Every structure is written in structure tokens, then in C-alpha cells.
């Protein structure tokens, strides 16, 4: 069975009386080399457990199952569960759970796997759900080694941007707090069925085992990042004054300058280390007023 062959994909879909569901962002890869490259880049440790989000008909699942000790897949579409039983039946190290990843208790689902060894994530994510799923994985506190995702190239550019670049935004800074993102390769739109309107990029995020950043108040740091980018056309002092009513614009400007920045700097110029220092200073200023 070749799950990258468009004819076999259509035969399988017809066999199970299924249609491609655009609302779920279902696009199936038809390039076997790309599939194998994604699987190879997912994790360095072949003894790992892989959490696959959105396996579809198993296009990537088989390659993961052939490379890693165990694959646990989460599939939201109930209609694809019997399809996966058919396409992945020969792989005893593969299992699928019919559940929405946004509602799933990943800690409970993968408890034995985390206790046994390393766990990484692999997913082909549609645009509309990329950020929510990524944030759930990052904020879960679970010790994933890597998160490898295939996403729209435009989104990948934002995830991998460096401070000072136009693509750099709140999600970039937040991601940099948890790990390091690297774009592995681009996948042209014509490698999918149905073909999306844009190219995709495979991004691997290596999560820190011990984070190098230590804000005094993590929630305040995230609040600072959010405020800095909600009005990105404005200077950082103006953006922060809209997000921190506890302090005056003058106080915030003084804090920005005290942290070593120009008074007219914009948020996109600050690295995650800068945001940690800035949020710590803001926190101290707020506390001093109480």
C-alpha cells in the first residue's frame, strides 16, 4: 500500500465513502520523499514515542511507525478512524485516539511514555489552529523533546524570525522562551491533495530541557509581550501604556530606557531576553506603587 499515491488515496477515500473535509484543513501529502524527510527530522532518538496530531489516512503515520518505537495519533475526524485501522493495521506500535487535541489530557494520555523515555510531537497543522495547538503544547509543561510541524510557509517565517525582522511577533517571542525553532525545508503546494493555495514549511522546535530565561513573574512577561505587539505600529512605550494602566507612559518610558533601549524603540526589536528584563522592571515598578 502506497499512501502517497493519489490513486490509492482516492481509492481508500471511496472505499470508506469519505470526502476531503476542508473545514478540518485536510490536505494529504503525495510525495513519499517529503514524508520520509519529515519523519527523519522529527526526532533524533529512534526509541522515542511520537505523538502525531491529525494523522489523516496515515500518510505520515507509517513512516513514523517504521522509525520510532511507538506512535500515538490523535484524530478529530471520527470518519478516519476505520480508515487508519485499515491503512495502519500492520503496525503494532501504532495506536489512534479519536479526540480533539485541544480537549485531550495529554499528560494522562502519554504518562507511561514520558516515564519510559523521550516523547516528541509531529503534526501537519492547518492555519486556523496552528497557534492554539502550539500554545497548548508549550504551556502544558509536559517534557516534550521536539515539536515538528508542517505549517503554511508564512506562519513558519513568523515562528522562526529573529528580533528586528518584520515577521517577528508575539508568538515568535513566546516560542523563543520555550525553545529554538528551525525551518527544515519547504514543501510546494502541488505535493498535496487537495492542493492548498500556498506552500508549506516543516519547522522543528527543540524545547529547552532547562530554560535559560528566568522571569520573576512569567504571567507578567507574557502580558508584556502581548501588550508590546498588540499595537505594533506604535512605539513600545505607547503600546505598553495601553496594556499597563498601573503605570504612566512616562514611567514606562523611563523603564525602557533604564533597560538599555532607546525611548522610541518598537517591540519587534526586543529579544526574549529583553522582554524578561523589561517585565521584571515593570513588575518592580508596579510593586513599588502598592
Question: What is each model feature region?
Answer:
Residues 249-252:
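Short amphipathic alpha-helix in the helical subdomain of ABC transporter nucleotide-binding domains
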Amino acid at each position: 500500500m502506497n499512501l502517497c499515491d493519489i490513486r490509492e488515496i482516492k481509492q481508500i477515500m471511496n472505499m470508506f465513502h469519505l470526502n476531503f473535509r476542508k473545514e478540518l484543513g485536510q490536505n494529504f501529502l503525495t510525495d513519499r520523499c517529503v514524508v520520509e524527510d519529515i519523519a527523519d527530522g522529527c526526532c533524533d532518538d529512534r526509541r522515542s514515542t511520537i505523538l502525531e496530531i491529525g494523522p489523516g489516512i496515515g500518510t505520515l503515520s507509517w513512516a513514523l511507525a517504521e522509525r520510532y518505537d511507538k506512535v500515538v495519533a490523535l484524530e478529530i475526524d471520527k470518519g478516519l478512524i476505520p480508515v487508519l485501522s485499515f491503512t495502519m493495521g500492520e503496525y503494532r506500535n501504532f495506536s489512534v485516539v479519536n479526540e480533539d487535541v485541544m480537549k485531550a489530557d495529554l499528560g494522562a494520555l502519554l504518562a507511561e511514555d514520558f516515564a519510559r523515555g523521550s516523547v516528541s510531537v509531529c503534526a501537519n497543522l492547518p492555519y486556523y489552529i496552528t497557534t492554539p495547538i502550539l500554545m497548548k503544547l508549550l504551556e502544558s509543561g509536559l517534557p516534550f523533546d521536539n515539536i515538528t510541524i508542517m505549517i503554511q510557509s508564512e506562519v513558519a517565517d513568523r515562528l522562526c524570525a529573529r528580533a528586528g525582522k518584520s515577521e517577528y511577533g508575539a508568538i515568535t517571542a513566546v516560542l523563543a522562551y520555550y525553545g529554538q525553532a528551525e525551518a527544515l525545508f519547504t514543501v510546494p503546494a502541488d505535493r498535496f491533495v487537495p492542493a492548498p493555495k500556498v506552500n508549506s514549511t516543516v519547522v522543528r522546535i527543540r524545547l529547552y530541557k532547562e530554560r535559560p530565561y528566568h522571569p520573576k513573574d512569567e504571567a507578567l512577561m507574557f502580558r508584556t509581550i502581548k501588550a508590546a505587539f498588540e499595537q505594533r505600529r506604535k512605539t513600545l512605550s505607547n503600546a505598553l501604556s495601553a496594556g499597563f494602566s498601573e503605570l504612566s507612559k512616562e514611567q514606562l518610558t523611563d523603564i525602557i530606557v533604564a533597560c538599555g533601549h532607546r525611548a522610541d524603540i518598537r517591540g519587534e526589536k526586543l529579544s526574549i531576553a529583553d522582554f524578561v528584563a523589561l517585565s521584571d522592571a515593570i513588575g518592580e515598578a508596579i510593586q513599588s506603587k502598592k
